[in-house]
C-alpha cells in the first residue's frame, strides 16, 4: 500500500511539474520572448530609432489611418454635406502625395537641410500634418477647397515621414544585416496593431467628439513626428551643391528610363497599373447607403468603426496565409486565384444591397463584418505577391527610389479607380438620398474585376526564389547614380484597394 501511495504521489508531482513547465512555456512565448526581442532591438539599434519606428508606423500610419478614414467619411457627409460621388473623387485627391513618393525619397537622399538628411524632414512632416489637422479642427464652416487642401497637406506629412523612416530602416539594415528581417517585422507589427486600434476606436471617438474633434487628436499625433526629428540620432552629412543635386536628379531619370525598357519590368508595371485602375472604388457610395439609406441598416458611428476593424483583422489573416502557405507558389498563380475570388467577393455587396441576406436570416452587421473581413483578406493576398515581385524589379544602385516609383504606379491606378468609381456613382444618380441604382453600380464594379484576370500573362510565371532582371542590372552599380539608401518596408503597411 505504501508503494502504491508513493507511486501515486510521484505521478501527481510529475503531472504538476509538467503543467508548470507548460505554463512557463506559454508565458515565455507570449510575454517574455517578445520583451527580450524588443529589448535586443533597442540595445542594438538605439532607442531613438526604435521610438521613430513606433511613432511613424504605429501612430502616424497605423493609428492615424484608422482614425482619419472614418472621420473623413463623416466629415464629408455631415460637415461638408457632399454627394457620395464627390466624396469618392476627393478621397482620391487626398492620396496624391503618395503618388509622388519618389520625389520625397530623392529629396531626403540628396538634399540635406542644415547638414542633416533625416531629422529636418521628420520635423517638416510633423508641422505640415499638425497645422493642417488643427485648421480642420478649429475652423468652423471651412470652405471645401480649403478643407481639401488641409487633408492633402496632412497626407503629404504622413507620406514624407513614411519615406524618411524607410531610409532610416534601410540604413540600419546595412549596418546590422542580421537584424534586417527583425526590423521589417517590427515595422509591420507596429502598423498592424496601430491600424487595428485606430479602426476600433474611430467610431466611438467620432460619436463622442465629432469628426472635427478626431482631427484635433490627429494633430496631436502629428506633433509626435516633430519629437522624432528632434531626438533621432543622426550624424551630419556633407551638403551638396545645386549643380550636383541637379545631376543626381538627371541621372536618376536616365537610369529609370533605361530600366523600363526591359520587358521584364514594364509588363508587370502595366499589369499593376491596369488592374488597380479598373477595380473601381465605390466605398463612399456603400458608406452613405449603410448609414443614411432608409432601406439600409442605418449603422451607428460605433458600428462603422468596429466593421472596419474586422477589415484590419482580415488583412492580418491574409498576410499570415501568404507567408505560411502561398509565398513559394508562382506569382501568376497566386494573383490569378486571388483575382478570381475578388470577383466573387464583390457580389457580396449586391446580396447586402438587395437585402437577400435578411431573407436568408443573416443580420446586416454579421454579413457586413464577414464581407469586410473576406474582401480585405483577398485584397492582401492579391497584393503581397505583387509587392515581392516589385522588389525583384529594382536594379542595383537605385533600389529604394525605383521601388517607391513602382508603388507610385500602383497609387496612380488606385487614384484612377477612385475617380472612376465617383464618375460611375454620379452617372447612375446615386446620391445622399437616392440609392435605387446602387445595385447596378455594384454589378458593373464586380464585372470590371474580371478584366485583370485576362492580363495575368503580363506577370512573369516565376516564384519568389527566382531572378527576373538580367545579371548586369543586378551586379552593376550606377556610376553616378542616385545615392539612395532606402528600400521600402511596406510588406505589412501599404493601404489597400
Swiss-Prot record:
It comes from the Eukaryota. GO terms for cellular component: membrane. It is found in: Membrane. The chain crosses the membrane at residues 40-60, 87-107, 120-140, 145-165, 186-206, 212-232, 269-289, 302-322, 334-354, 358-378, 405-425, 439-459. InterPro entries: BT1 (IPR039309), FBT (IPR004324), MFS_trans_sf (IPR036259). It holds the Pfam family BT1. Its main location: membrane. Keywords: Membrane, Transmembrane, Transmembrane helix, Transport. It is a multi-pass membrane protein. Signal peptide: none annotated. SUPFAM superfamilies: MFS general substrate transporter. Could mediate folate transport. Belongs to the major facilitator superfamily. Folate-biopterin transporter (TC 2.A.71) family. This is Probable folate-biopterin transporter 3. It comes from Arabidopsis thaliana (Mouse-ear cress).
